[in-house]
Swiss-Prot record:
<keyword id="KW-0865">Zymogen</keyword>
<dbReference type="GO" id="GO:0008237">
    <property type="term" value="F:metallopeptidase activity"/>
</dbReference>
<dbReference type="GO" id="GO:0046872">
    <property type="term" value="F:metal ion binding"/>
</dbReference>
<keyword id="KW-0482">Metalloprotease</keyword>
<keyword id="KW-0645">Protease</keyword>
<keyword id="KW-0862">Zinc</keyword>
<feature type="region of interest" description="Disordered">
    <location>
        <begin position="160"/>
        <end position="209"/>
    </location>
</feature>
<keyword id="KW-0378">Hydrolase</keyword>
<dbReference type="GO" id="GO:0006508">
    <property type="term" value="P:proteolysis"/>
</dbReference>
<comment type="similarity">
    <text>Belongs to the peptidase M5 family.</text>
</comment>
<feature type="propeptide">
    <location>
        <begin position="35"/>
        <end position="205"/>
    </location>
</feature>
<feature type="binding site">
    <location>
        <position position="445"/>
    </location>
    <ligand>
        <name>Zn(2+)</name>
    </ligand>
</feature>
<dbReference type="GO" id="GO:0005576">
    <property type="term" value="C:extracellular region"/>
</dbReference>
<feature type="binding site">
    <location>
        <position position="407"/>
    </location>
    <ligand>
        <name>Zn(2+)</name>
    </ligand>
</feature>
<keyword id="KW-0732">Signal</keyword>
<keyword id="KW-0964">Secreted</keyword>
<feature type="signal peptide">
    <location>
        <begin position="1"/>
        <end position="34"/>
    </location>
</feature>
Length: 550
């Protein structure tokens, strides 16, 4: 496995590029989703830039350059502005912008010839805070990450002239208000100045006196955009609870007192609810608030470019006595992709096919290794996993696709099943999901595809730009190569074996945790029968339907 260096985020510039000429880290497990170098006749690229950093009320020119190295009959251009920016002078070639909780979106279908096309439009800053402009270009008729480009411009809009800065910091942030995605005000959070003392000062507990327990409840939710159910120019909007997130209840017993950890727990699986209780030391607790982190116990987490977990802090409750509710707390809008990736891993966790309380059966209870995802706004460090640090690296818009997140996590799962060992994989960079690569690439990538299919109960692959491809196949499927060197054939054959022969994938995963396979042939012919998994006529017929014959 080659070594590589994790690229840490740098302050964002005014210009961002994606697609053509993108630089990729050398990794051992290149993904079907990675923006790997593609043949010259299949490249699309896009850049986006602002001519100035606008403060609130000021305008700036957004310039988008689309580059093609081949003819593309229908290229889809999608532009998304955050709620803090508004289109004020639209280029007439673009569709009328639509507005939703995520900001404004406009698009256009283009016919491209080799060269560069430029589109300009005027935008205005209408609110302060972190902001991200995104541009996507893709081949509508041939969805594939190698025929697509993504660009991102990040800035933090200030109120006073000249106060807007490059880049955006959202690792630690306040919750987004229930009524909308942004707010000029900031809720009280740890370290903030203490409010005025309550009109009735709290009474300190007399020696030996105990006050009744206080419970604080609420629900954590996340608003995000999803490629599942969306399209290249309109991803689906989702508003869902966040499951199994670490939550800590903090407080100050008195107005001038120090911050204390009162209680900790997890949000509820499926509903995002929490109820944390503590025994106060005074009759009234001056302040109480909740902090949520993108970590589930110690089993999985999402971190930024510096390996820090994202955290969202609720508004503070004042003068607390008796049971209270924080109501619905929304993850900070700038962190929505981190929380989406986090909650996507929860789907995989509850159907991971393990007989232990770890990700895989070969790990002992209480001695589990986690799955870690690294993502940050504007990231170009993706899309891949490495077994050197057992970390998934997602690029900027990757978390919008749950399939992408789980595909990469599927590599981590295989690495755990193999206890850190990895096959010697050849002819896998680049590789195409529906084309022949090698039998080792077809096996490792096909397994990761199958993990995504199994988790989402489908055979549709989605990408972060909203495009998708249905990979359901048989011997008559056109546009897909035959055999076990094609990952789509391997992935769909695996899920059919699990569902139609094995009664789920737990037995297969247990077998994989005891034996190592470099190819699908080895998995099917050698190890399945050795562990009592069917490789007879019914199983072979499934493979035959997916053009795999042994």
């Amino acid at each position: 496995m080659p070594m590589f260096r994790i690229r840490l985020p740098k302050p964002a510039a005014l210009i961002a590029a994606g697609g053509i000429g993108a630089c990729i880290a050398t990794v051992a497990v290149p993904s079907a989703y990675a923006a790997a170098p593609a043949p010259a006749d299949s490249r699309l690229g896009v850049t986006a830039s602002l001519d100035r950093l606008p403060s609130i009320g000021e305008r700036s020119t957004l310039t988008v350059n689309i580059t093609a190295e081949t003819d593309v009959k229908r290229a889809g251009l999608s532009l998304q502005l955050p709620p803090a920016l508004r289109i004020v002078d639209r280029n007439p070639s673009l569709a009328a912008p639509t507005t939703d909780p995520f900001g404004q979106r406009t698009s256009r279908t283009l016919t491209l010839t080799p060269g560069t096309r430029t589109i300009e439009l005027e935008v205005k800053a209408v609110a302060t805070g972190p902001a991200q402009i995104q541009a996507d270009i893709s081949d509508i008729d041939r969805p594939d990450p190698r025929r697509a480009g993504h660009a991102s411009v990040e800035l933090t809009i200030g109120k006073a002239k000249g106060s807007t800065a490059k880049g955006m910091s959202v690792t630690k942030a306040d919750a987004t208000p229930v009524s909308g995605p942004t707010t000029p005000g900031r809720p009280v959070r740890p370290g903030a100045a203490a409010p005025a003392a309550p009109s009735t000062p709290p009474q300190a507990a007399a020696p030996g006196k105990r006050y009744a327990p206080v419970c604080v409840s609420g629900t954590l939710r996340n608003r995000f955009q999803s490629s599942e159910g969306g399209s290249w120019n309109s991803k689906a909007s989702r508003d869902l609870p966040v499951s199994n997130a670490n939550v800590t209840l903090w407080g100050r017993a008195t107005a001038g007192g120090g911050t204390q950890k009162l209680a900790a727990g997890l949000t509820g699986n499926g509903d995002g609810t929490f109820k944390l209780c503590y025994t106060p030391s005074t009759s009234v607790t001056s302040q109480v608030w909740a902090e949520f982190q993108t970590q589930a116990g110690t089993m999985w987490s999402v971190v930024d470019g510096y390996n820090r977990r994202y955290s969202t802090t609720s508004n503070a409750l004042s003068n607390v006595s008796g049971n209270k509710s924080l109501g619905t707390v929304y993850a900070n809008s700038g962190q929505s992709r981190a929380w989406h990736a986090f909650d996507t891993l929860n789907k995989l966790w509850w159907d991971r096919g393990s007989t232990s309380t770890c990700w895989t059966s070969n790990q002992r209870d209480g001695r589990c290794t986690p799955i870690t995802v690294q993502w940050y706004p504007g990231s170009t460090d993706g899309t891949y996993w490495t077994n050197r640090d057992d970390k998934v690296h997602l690029a900027d818009s990757d978390p919008d696709s749950g399939h992408t997140t789980v595909h990469e996590a599927g590599h981590s799962l295989m690495g755990k099943l193999y206890n850190g060992w990895w096959p010697y994989v050849t002819n896998c960079s680049p590789h195409y999901i529906n084309r022949t690569s090698s039998t080792t690439c077809g096996w490792t990538e096909g397994f990761a595809d199958a993990v995504a299919f199994h988790t989402f109960k489908d055979t549709v692959m989605t990408w972060g730009n909203g495009s998708s491809m249905n990979l359901a196949n048989d011997r008559g499927t056109r546009g897909m190569d035959w055999g076990d060197a094609c990952e789509a054939r391997v992935g769909t054959a695996l899920v059919d074996l699990w569902s139609q022969v094995d009664g789920g994938w737990t037995k297969s995963n247990t077998m994989m945790s005891r034996e190592r396979q470099s190819t699908f042939r080895e998995y099917f012919l050698t190890d399945r029968p050795a562990y009592g998994l069917d490789s007879g006529p019914k199983a072979r017929n499934i493979l035959y339907g997916h053009t795999i014959q042994y």
